[in-house]
Amino acid sequence: MDGWQRVFVLHGRPYSETSLLLDLFTENEGRISVLAKGARGRRSNLKGCLQPFTPLLVRWSGRGAIKTLRDADPISLALPLTGSVLYSGLYINELLSRVLEQGTAYPALFFDYLQCLQILAASEYTPEYALRRFELALLANLGYGVDYLHCAGSGEPVADTMTYRYREEKGFIASLVVDHYSFTGRELKSLATREFPDSATLKAAKRFTRIALKPYLGGKPLKSRELFRQFVRQQPEKKEN
C-alpha cells in the first residue's frame, strides 16, 4: 500500500526480540495484521505510539496475510480511557478482532468505532450507552438486517406496549410469551434508533446484542469481560454513611 491510512491498533504482541505483531483496524481495508520490525528496540521511535486508542496514520507493504509496517505517525495523543472505561475500550477492540474478517473494508464502522471511543473518553454518557450503540452499528455493518420496526409475522408496525419474541433469521414476532428473547415494541424502537432514554431500554439493548453477537463469537468467552470482572473485584467497598 503506497498511501497513508487512518488506523487504530486493536491488539499487539511481542514478535521475536525487538518486533511487534499488530492487529490493526484501518479506515479503508478493515482489519489487517502487520509486523512492526524493530518496534520494541531501544532506538525505535514507534514504542510510544503503537498502542490501542491512539489515532495513527500508517503505511505498510506486502501481499500476504501479514503485512510489513513501513511508517506510522500519531495523529493526536491517545484518547484518555482510564479506570472502568479502559475495559470498555478493550472490549470493543476484542470484539472487532474476533468478529471482523481480515481484509474486508468497513469505512462506516471505522467512524462508529472512533465515535464510540470519543464518547467513552468524554464521559458525558455512561459506558453502556456507548457500547450498545457500537454493538448495534457492528451488527448492521456485518449485514445483520433484522427489522426492528415491523412484526415479522404480520408485517404490521410494532406497537409500544405489545411484546415481540425474537427468532433468529426471522425477526421479531408478536407473542404472549415473556422470556429472555422477548422485547416490547418501545424497546425495539430504541434499538432501531440506537437511542436509549432510560435504563429499561438500555438493558433491553444489552440483552439483544448479547443474543445477536453470540453466533459470531462462538463459545469462546471474551477476555476483556473477565479482566473487567477482576477490576471490579479489586475495587475497595464503599462504606455506608
UniProtKB/Swiss-Prot annotation:
The keyword DNA repair applies. GO terms for cellular component: bacterial nucleoid. The keyword Disulfide bond does not apply. Keywords: DNA damage, DNA recombination, DNA repair. One of its GO terms (biological process) is DNA recombination. Belongs to the RecO family. NCBIfam families: reco. Involved in DNA repair and RecF pathway recombination. This is DNA repair protein RecO. The gene is recO.
